[in-house]
Amino acid sequence: MSGFALFINRPVATSLLALAITLVGLLGLRLLPVAPLPQVDFPVIMVSASLPGASAETMAASVAMPLERALGRIAGVNEMTSSSSLGTTRIILQFNLDRNIDGAARDVQAALNAAQSLLPSGMPSRPSYRKANPSDAPIAILTLTSAQYSQGDLYDLASTRLAQKIAQINGVGDVSVSGSSLPAVRIDLNPDALFNQGTSLDTVRQAIASANVRRPLGAVADDGRRWQVQSNDALMTAQEYRPLIIRYRDGAPLRLQDVARISDGVEDVRNAGMSNGQPAILIMIRRSADANIIETVDRLRSDLPALQALLPGGVSLDIAQDRTPTIRASLREVEQSLAIAIALVILVVFLFLRSARATLIPAVTVPVSLIGTCAAIYLCGFSLNNLSLMALTIASGFVVDDAIVVLENIARHIEDGLSPHRAALAGVREVGFTVFSISLSLAAVFIPLLFMGGIPGRLFHEFAITLSASIAISLLIALTLTPMMCARLLRPRHTDGGMRPTALRRLSALLQRGYALSLNWTLDHARWVLLTLLAVIGLNIWLYISIPKTFFPQQDTGRLMGFIQADQSISFQAMRGKLQDFMHIVRADPDVDNVTGFTGGTRVNSGMMFIALKPLGERKQDAQQVIARLRTRLSHEPGANLFLMAVQDIRAGGRQGNASYQYTLLSDDLAVLRHWEPQVRKALAALPQLTDVSTDQQDKGTEMLLTYDRPAMARLGIKVSEVNTLLSNAFGQRQISTLYQPLNQYHVVMEVDPRYAQDERALDKMFIINQAGQPIPLSGFASWLPANAPLSVNHQGLSAAATISFNLPPGGSLSDASDAIAHAMTALGTPPSLRGTFAGTALLFQQAQSSQLLLILAAIATVYIVLGILYESYIHPLTILSTLPSAGVGALLALMLFNAPFSLIALIGIMLLIGLVKKNAILLVDFALTAEREQHLSARDAIYQACLLRFRPILMTTLAALFGALPLAFSYGDGAELRQPLGITIVGGLLVSQILTLYTTPVVYLYMEKLRARFSRQKALPPLAY
């Protein structure tokens, strides 16, 4: 008894095998996590260091460079960028995809420890790190609002009570709080009153620090009791500081309230946050690199009542924005496409076989194969995401192929007079090797994908494993369950309750007769057909060169990020007004649902906005159209620019640019970089292939440059360090004392009252008390002039860097933009000391584009090797592969027709076509070789008979695969921009391939047979058989 007979004769065992596959698949489906895409995030660690009051250039030289030299030695770092601004340095380390984030964090900590001795001694704390990418869009934004509490109090609640609890949620990588700063006692000094009293700013500082000292005072005890000694040595509120005596003058006390305004405020008054136009504290939550967005947000939502319980009455905690609704909607759309695809595939089978009994067989085998695949997805540690669901949708079109080939062949034997049982045995034996060849060669396409690295490799890997698993399960079902069901369900036509001859059946017969006549003509004019095939190959090359290319389709996630960039000399008050104006304009758009934003911190000329659009079904336009509309309205706002970009699921690089793509200029000479960056930016801004061109080069800030008269200072008894201390006390929002509270530590902040520090004339009011006790005005030993100074200094690697960000205009492609940038750089004639390189997603595109052709050739070579092994022939694998050029032309023409650029998703479609379209040739070649060997027919008669005999199954399998891809090609709704390129590629490729290969494959077969006969007198060994 053969293996096929075993399954046909034991229906219970075969049915239970299928049931077991289904149950295991359902269990896997239930346990599968849900995500927008496969896990493709680079491990990223952010290092932060601070030195209050230090300029951007000082931070870059004394803090960033020592840290970069130490961190650059860590294994697996593929990109290191840093940004230094007033008092802070931030270094972003991006690691290789295969680097474990926890191991990388240990290496980072070791490098920070090694670099500690090289850092300035005045740093208030050691550098710290976080395992999160600051350039990622938050997965959720919480807002804290209240009519009873101040912004400082709300910030305190958020940072003290909420941030730590949220950070403990599994999957959360970083929690940042914006919109204000911690509460503080603020001392705003009156320089005129101090001068009149002959009291220096440092005297005030020392008096405050001495009055607020908390030290352990010990305990007293007798034989039976013990008392802890405590005192009121700490001053905690503004009210307690006001009567503080600074000094005595002529026997009279000088109190703090006599020379300063004391209030309960915040540490940094130059921060503002808003939500929908109202003041709010923003809690931005980013996930860790390996976390699942949906699971993380679900945990956050479940913990929300407990978080609200930590807050006092009158404080509202709300989720202002959440990225998961559009992700869930996108997955629902793919699930609907999958259901439609399965229904269409089964309809194709019904229309061709015209039998409800026959249609029931693929109606069972297709779901079993697809459900069983879910178990494989779970065992491999993957998720249920857009790509894996698209893979299942496409699989619905070709897992039915195996069942169709077996079913159609068995049905043909029944029509020829065999009993269903004998027809099942004969039919499955006859096509078993063919089905095996189709499945194995289809799976072979994905072998090169498993060796790809980077983000494309991660995407392809999961897609390839999913499809390979579906192919393997489909093959098993086709050779076991399908023949068993055929033996039990199929009946001869005269006893079957199937449909009688219909117009469709007559049309099918007419098509077959027409094909027979046209095939004869084609074989008589084989040379012209061969020339046509060569022309198709040339057309492939031209189309691939001509088609616009991009890395990944622009997604509409329903979320936009806005970056406000104002004049580098703008004040905080003016910047806050710009933020309010921009938020008002954006909120007025009919497609916008929610807007949050903040400004302040070390870069007072910038701000950030997070915009949630209405659900796709409730708005009239997609994200890119909304951006274009807002860009027009926002262009009339003077003094600042708002750059908008749609949040994407795939983003690389740690630098937070103003747009989706980056081009970085590098130089070891900062002067060269600063000279050429404006010229390069101007040239790129003039390119029509780019839009929203901006730069992170902030070197036009205004400063007052002081020049000390050192001989005069020596004569007056004044030290440079004393002058620097004076200026820090006056203008640096200096934290001069610490307030220790049960839940947090706060500070006393001292500076000159902002009313006396609005312009450069504030320096005229500064004075210092020399060693002789005389008040000496600053102008007595120093002069100053306005000058330009960098607000930030950026590095990449160990070189000075300036990153130019850009978006693409509507209909633009990344390949056109890349070519235009390359030509512009060549035309500028930049010096060798200035290097230009793409960064982030644009760099990934460059890397992926260089390997695309190699990947396609590797897949073709793998298929050739597998087919050569199966058929023991060097020649006929070429016959089978001759079907590929027509599929490529169809796919590329379809993409161009629908104005879709060639992306990674389209490349996945091309790889699928390599596996799909060759099955037609396999069916023909396999039957032709068998007819030559067993019936001793000539090559022409054998291929002619094979074409007519396999016309119906070829038509059925191609239409099944085509109809399986149609729901993707014509999909709409959330996530359609991901599904459409895949569906368009497959539908276009299958259509053109189906038309051409029915004629080119027989011609190529004849030429290959002539070639084989010429070079070998011996007949090729027969292929492997069961």
Curated annotation (Swiss-Prot):
Q: Which UniProt keywords apply?
A: Cell inner membrane, Cell membrane, Membrane, Transmembrane, Transmembrane helix, Transport
The cross-references to InterPro entries, in alphabetical order and at most eight, read: AcrB_DN_DC_subdom, Acrflvin-R, Multidrug-R_MdtC
The UniProt entry lists membrane topology as: Multi-pass membrane protein
Q: Name one Pfam family in it.
A: ACR_tran
TM regions (residue ranges): 16-36, 333-353, 360-380, 387-407, 435-455, 459-479, 528-548, 853-873, 897-917, 953-973, 984-1004
The GO terms describing molecular function are:
xenobiotic transmembrane transporter activity
Localization recorded for this chain is: Cell inner membrane
Q: Does the record's keyword annotation contain Transport?
A: yes
Q: Its GO CC terms?
A: plasma membrane
Q: How does it assemble?
A: Part of a tripartite efflux system composed of MdtA, MdtB and MdtC. MdtC forms a heteromultimer with MdtB.
The family annotation for this protein states:
Belongs to the resistance-nodulation-cell division (RND) (TC 2.A.6) family. MdtC subfamily.
Protein's recorded name:
Multidrug resistance protein MdtC
User: What high-level taxonomic lineage is stated for the organism?
Assistant: Bacteria, Pseudomonadati, Pseudomonadota, Gammaproteobacteria, Enterobacterales
